[in-house]
Every structure is written in structure tokens, then in C-alpha cells.
């Protein structure tokens, strides 16, 4: 299964795996699954780290974190393509969930045929045309 890791899942997997649910941990550890992190998440971590958002302050410098995850866990990097951005027009816009990072990750998962691994209640609360797992 191709798993697109939501930003917080990527951070937890890399630095605090004890925060992952048992299911999420098992999915990340399963060698049959392909783990993918989006450039969107890397961008989100960088921005929120600079803003001092506690949940995105990573102990390891971001470039080293990405390098180590690619080497140790074979995490692939997903670039942002125009098809991902154009897929946003087909997503419903919910007043309680307008996060542009989340919306682009959802669009990427749809276009790439990936399952989005996220613990974000807002994503699970709404009906998006994507497979979401916790």
C-alpha cells in the first residue's frame, strides 16, 4: 500500500514514534508499504517551525531529518505537480477545515492513488474522496 504520511505522522514517525497509534506504527513498519512524504509537509514543517509552533519544532535539523528518513526507512519524497493543485477544485470546501496544507495533501493522495495516514480529527470528520487511516 502506498501511504502518504500527513505532516504530524511524518514528524512522529521520525522523532516520536510512541505518539503513533498501534495501527499507524504497524503500517509504517510494514515492509510491503511504501512510505511517502510530500514536499507540502516539508514546507509546512519549515514554516511552522519558524513560527515556533510546538508540535512542529523538530529536534533534528529538517534537512538531516529528511535524509535520515529516506535512508533508514526508505521514505520517498512526493513533489507538488500541477495535477495535484488542479485536483483541489474537486474537493469540497468545509467551513471548519480550510487548512491549505491538508487540502493539498488530500488532493495528492487522490491523484497518486495513495492512502493518507493522518490522526487529524478534522480530516476524519469530513467526507473526502480519499482513503484515510489513523
Spell out what each predicted region is:
Residues 72-119:
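Active-site neighborhoods of divalent-metal-dependent phosphate/nucleic-acid chemistry enzymes
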Residues 45:
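Phosphate/NTP-binding elements of NTP-utilizing enzymes
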Residues 9, 41, 84, 105, ...:
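Alpha-helix capping/helix-boundary segments
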Residues 16-17, 48-51, 91, 129-130:
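Residue-level signal for well-ordered alpha-helical positions
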Amino acid at each position: 500500500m502506498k501511504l502518504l504520511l500527513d505532516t504530524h505522522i511524518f514528524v512522529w514517525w521520525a522523532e516520536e514514534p510512541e505518539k503513533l497509534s498501534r495501527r499507524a506504527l504497524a503500517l509504517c513498519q510494514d515492509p510491503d508499504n511504501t512510505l511517502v512524504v510530500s514536499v507540502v509537509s516539508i514546507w509546512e514543517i519549515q514554516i511552522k517551525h519558524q513560527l515556533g509552533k510546538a508540535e512542529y519544532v523538530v529536534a533534528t535539523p529538517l534537512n538531516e531529518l529528511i535524509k535520515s528518513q529516506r535512508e533508514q526507512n526508505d521514505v520517498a519524497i512526493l513533489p507538488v505537480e500541477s495535477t495535484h493543485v488542479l485536483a483541489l477544485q474537486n474537493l469540497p470546501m468545509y467551513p471548519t477545515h480550510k487548512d491549505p496544507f491538508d487540502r493539498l495533501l488530500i488532493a495528492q493522495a487522490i491523484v497518486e492513488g495513495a492512502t493518507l495516514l493522518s490522526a487529524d480529527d478534522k480530516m476524519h470528520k469530513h467526507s473526502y474522496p480519499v482513503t484515510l487511516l489513523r
